[in-house]
């Protein structure tokens, strides 16, 4: 009964207005009130503040500052094997596995279209058809910065407007095409492991999605698809990120989806739906690598 109520609220509540209100409030400096809200959040969600660079909740001027708190450098060691890719975020695996043609598994009884997820981009869809995917859900208590699974050269970013349904196991099991319907930021990289996409998916109360190269991508929510492109690594204006380096962040919640081309990586056998993830641990192992020189000179 409670689950039905939660799902019903997802359909009838003014999600955009709630999200904008939450984003506004989370960015305000409230002094003692801000500290009280942060303390209540830490208590309710059992957030481990010992991992944070600033464990004292009084040191955060806004709730957003707390939510995107950086961790101590040693809190998340990054796997150094050059043939292994690493998990991009703390959280839990929602689903992972092969992309069956154009279909990605969402939950029992639900798949969604790769092309729909990629906003109808046929060229990008062809890169990842029959490849591999990993969907990672970030719970409220988790660290909400997102990092690189491997070295990468940014080539394309697409902002896709959409719904702002809550993203959690309940909605994944009951709302068809959830990840292809919600607002999202698609980032495509050239890597030694072939093309890779990392998608930051919005949700109700996700005040903003940011990247390290562009700052805040959303809001504003203008309702139109936006696309940016970047040159190869040896050209002026290139964006090159290293394995384990931060690439983006959520100011409140949501989900990261990774896409890999066919025949390039083997996902870690230890990872299954529901597995807890820690940034920097092994995500996948190379099956086929390109030379760094070839990656640097991709057209």
Curated annotation (Swiss-Prot):
InterPro entries: PS_Dcarbxylase, PSD-B, PSD_type1_pro
Protein name: Phosphatidylserine decarboxylase proenzyme
Membrane-protein topology: Peripheral membrane protein
Reactions this protein catalyses: a 1,2-diacyl-sn-glycero-3-phospho-L-serine + H(+) = a 1,2-diacyl-sn-glycero-3-phosphoethanolamine + CO2
Function recorded in the entry: Catalyzes the formation of phosphatidylethanolamine (PtdEtn) from phosphatidylserine (PtdSer).
EC number: 4.1.1.65
GO BP terms, alphabetized: phosphatidylethanolamine biosynthetic process
Residues forming the catalytic site: 90 (charge relay system), 147 (charge relay system), 254 (charge relay system), 254 (schiff-base intermediate with substrate)
Organism of provenance: Erwinia tasmaniensis (strain DSM 17950 / CFBP 7177 / CIP 109463 / NCPPB 4357 / Et1/99)
One Pfam family cited in the UniProt record for this chain: PS_Dcarbxylase
Keyword Transcription recorded: no
Record-marked site positions (Cleavage (non-hydrolytic)): 253-254
């Amino acid at each position: 009964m409670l689950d039905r109520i939660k799902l019903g609220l997802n359909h009838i509540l003014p999600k955009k207005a709630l999200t904008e209100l939450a984003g506004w409030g989370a960015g305000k400096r409230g002094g003692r009130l801000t500290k009280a809200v942060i303390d209540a959040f830490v208590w309710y969600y059992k957030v481990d503040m010992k991992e944070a660079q600033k464990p004292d909740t009084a040191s955060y001027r806004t709730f957003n500052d707390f939510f995107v708190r950086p961790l101590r450098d040693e809190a998340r060691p990054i796997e150094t094997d050059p043939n292994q890719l690493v998990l991009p975020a703390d959280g839990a695996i929602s689903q992972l596995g092969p992309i069956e043609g154009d279909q990605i598994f969402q939950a029992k009884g639900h798949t969604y279209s790769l092309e729909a997820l990629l906003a109808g981009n046929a060229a990008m869809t062809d890169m990842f058809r029959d490849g591999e995917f990993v969907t990672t859900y970030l719970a409220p208590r988790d660290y909400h910065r997102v990092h690189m699974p491997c070295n990468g050269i940014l080539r394309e970013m697409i902002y896709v407007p959409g719904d702002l349904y809550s993203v959690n196991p309940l909605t994944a099991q009951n709302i068809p095409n959830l990840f292809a319907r919600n607002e999202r930021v698609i980032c495509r990289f050239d890597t030694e492991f072939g093309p890779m996409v990392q998608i930051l998916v919005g949700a109700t109360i996700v005040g903003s999605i940011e990247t390290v190269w562009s700052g805040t991508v959303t809001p504003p929510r203008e309702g139109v698809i936006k696309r940016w492109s970047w040159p190869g690594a040896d050209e002026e204006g290139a964006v090159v990120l290293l394995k384990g380096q931060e690439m983006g962040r959520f100011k409140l919640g949501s989900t990261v989806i990774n896409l890999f081309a066919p025949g390039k990586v083997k996902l870690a056998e230890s990872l299954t739906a529901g597995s807890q993830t820690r940034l920097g641990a092994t995500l996948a192992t190379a099956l086929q690598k390109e030379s760094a020189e070839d990656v640097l000179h991709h057209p």
